[in-house]
């Protein structure tokens, strides 16, 4: 089945906006028969906690030594009742600060805690999370960093767009209505005027914030043969 992909963008502190321009038409397969798990490059990981699947969507949170930041993020998500919409799964990159003790996570309705054991950093953590989510049949995945810089209120809107048939949603700090906090000037310049324009030119899609990790993916996108997990 073919899907029209629109590039969605968002304000990370309260309001999500969507670019009205339609992008290229991309065909993603819905059938699970195309999944070839043997080709996935998944780092070794331990499943430290898994309470089972409750929802069709999950929120993946990559974390490493975030201390109070991850606690504050989980508290915000609890107040927003995110766990009523999606299963919350944390992917730990090897924290040593005690911020992810199981006893302290219970109050935040966390469904799973994965610990990456193999090589790699953030991208390796995310691959662990993607593989786990796909193995457990989730139809959509939202990723949000564990540093409490992104606004979890937008998770509800990301999920709504997945339900409407969108395959990829990404937040942006650099569009009208967007806002970034504590982004170094050199980093912002590099993203806005070097990385995003180069990626836009190479891909044929309009990117405004190519490094923002607050995203959502449909299952059919992640299992498509054109996507390398």
For each feature predicted by the language model, list its residue ranges.
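Short loop->beta transition adjacent to catalytic acidic/histidine clusters or analogous donor-positioning motifs
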Residues: 55-58, 78-89, 110-111
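Short beta-strand-to-loop acidic/aromatic patch adjacent to the donor-nucleotide binding site
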Residues: 138-149
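A conserved acidic beta->alpha catalytic loop
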Residues: 92-101, 148
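Residue-level signal for alpha-helix termini/capping positions
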Residues: 78, 82, 104, 134-135, ...
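Short beta-strand/loop segment that forms part of the nucleotide-sugar
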Residues: 61, 85-95, 144
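Donor nucleotide-sugar binding loop of glycosyltransferases
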Residues: 66-69, 95, 122, 151
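Acceptor/aglycone-binding surface of glycosyltransferases and processive sugar-polymer synthases
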Residues: 112, 116-135, 152-229
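N-proximal low-complexity "stem/linker" segments adjacent to membrane-targeting elements
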Residues: 2-76
